[in-house]
Amino acid sequence: MKVGIIGAMQQEVAILKEAMTNAQTVNKAGCTFYSGQINGVEVVLLQSGIGKVAAAIGTTILLDEYQPDMVLNTGSAGGFDSSLNLGDVVISTEVRHHDADVTAFGYEMGQMAGQPAAFLADEKLMNLAEKALEQMDGQHAVRGLICTGDAFVCTAERQAFIRQHFPSVIAVEMEASAIAQTCYQFKVPFVVVRAISDVADKESPMSFEEFLPLAAKSSSEMVFKMLELLK
């Protein structure tokens, strides 16, 4: 069994990389691939770079060349669910693009031509994430729709647009839908497990940059627990 793990930024993969044994590093097409073992599980850790194009390029190489049996997308996200606070975890049930619009041709908002409106996370991996969560005392999590776009959502106007078209959204970020679409086309199961670094409509004494290391720690701990359960 081989697990693909994807994070966009160095801060989002650093803790996982440090835990790897027998690690080998390959740089290709602007992406960095670390292959080795974490807690006895064979993994390939991808630092893809930020945004949907970078994520799609990296995920394609990961799936084609390393052929993992499953993909976990980790890192940070912006919270949209009112129950979320900084450091909480979100687990995807489905993933959608929030910045795609070909509704003029009869598609749903967020649906790309020739693609499903939503990319569904794997049920077994969602349940695995829930079991991992049970072993993390005090860690709050919400399960639901995660939306992706090539923009850092920080204006009230954009937040309102996303809420209008995707009323069940729990979090937004910048890579997951590209990863999900690539996994869908390769027929590889995936789940997104991210930690909240900022929350819409809630003031925080910490900036995104200040909280990112803590979000990375929370999401990495979830991945560690999931890998332990896979052994």
Swiss-Prot record:
<keyword id="KW-0486">Methionine biosynthesis</keyword>
<comment type="similarity">
    <text>Belongs to the PNP/UDP phosphorylase family. MtnN subfamily.</text>
</comment>
<dbReference type="GO" id="GO:0005829">
    <property type="term" value="C:cytosol"/>
</dbReference>
<comment type="function">
    <text>Catalyzes the irreversible cleavage of the glycosidic bond in both 5'-methylthioadenosine (MTA) and S-adenosylhomocysteine (SAH/AdoHcy) to adenine and the corresponding thioribose, 5'-methylthioribose and S-ribosylhomocysteine, respectively. Also cleaves 5'-deoxyadenosine, a toxic by-product of radical S-adenosylmethionine (SAM) enzymes, into 5-deoxyribose and adenine.</text>
</comment>
<keyword id="KW-0378">Hydrolase</keyword>
<dbReference type="GO" id="GO:0019284">
    <property type="term" value="P:L-methionine salvage from S-adenosylmethionine"/>
</dbReference>
<dbReference type="InterPro" id="IPR000845">
    <property type="entry name" value="Nucleoside_phosphorylase_d"/>
</dbReference>
<dbReference type="GO" id="GO:0019509">
    <property type="term" value="P:L-methionine salvage from methylthioadenosine"/>
</dbReference>
<feature type="binding site">
    <location>
        <position position="153"/>
    </location>
    <ligand>
        <name>substrate</name>
    </ligand>
</feature>
<dbReference type="GO" id="GO:0008782">
    <property type="term" value="F:adenosylhomocysteine nucleosidase activity"/>
</dbReference>
<feature type="binding site">
    <location>
        <begin position="174"/>
        <end position="175"/>
    </location>
    <ligand>
        <name>substrate</name>
    </ligand>
</feature>
<feature type="binding site">
    <location>
        <position position="78"/>
    </location>
    <ligand>
        <name>substrate</name>
    </ligand>
</feature>
<dbReference type="GO" id="GO:0008930">
    <property type="term" value="F:methylthioadenosine nucleosidase activity"/>
</dbReference>
<dbReference type="GO" id="GO:0009164">
    <property type="term" value="P:nucleoside catabolic process"/>
</dbReference>
<feature type="active site" description="Proton acceptor">
    <location>
        <position position="12"/>
    </location>
</feature>
<feature type="active site" description="Proton donor">
    <location>
        <position position="198"/>
    </location>
</feature>
<keyword id="KW-0028">Amino-acid biosynthesis</keyword>
<protein>
    <recommendedName>
        <fullName>5'-methylthioadenosine/S-adenosylhomocysteine nucleosidase</fullName>
        <ecNumber>3.2.2.9</ecNumber>
    </recommendedName>
</protein>
<comment type="pathway">
    <text>Amino-acid biosynthesis; L-methionine biosynthesis via salvage pathway; S-methyl-5-thio-alpha-D-ribose 1-phosphate from S-methyl-5'-thioadenosine (hydrolase route): step 1/2.</text>
</comment>
<dbReference type="InterPro" id="IPR035994">
    <property type="entry name" value="Nucleoside_phosphorylase_sf"/>
</dbReference>
<dbReference type="InterPro" id="IPR010049">
    <property type="entry name" value="MTA_SAH_Nsdase"/>
</dbReference>
<dbReference type="Pfam" id="PF01048">
    <property type="entry name" value="PNP_UDP_1"/>
</dbReference>
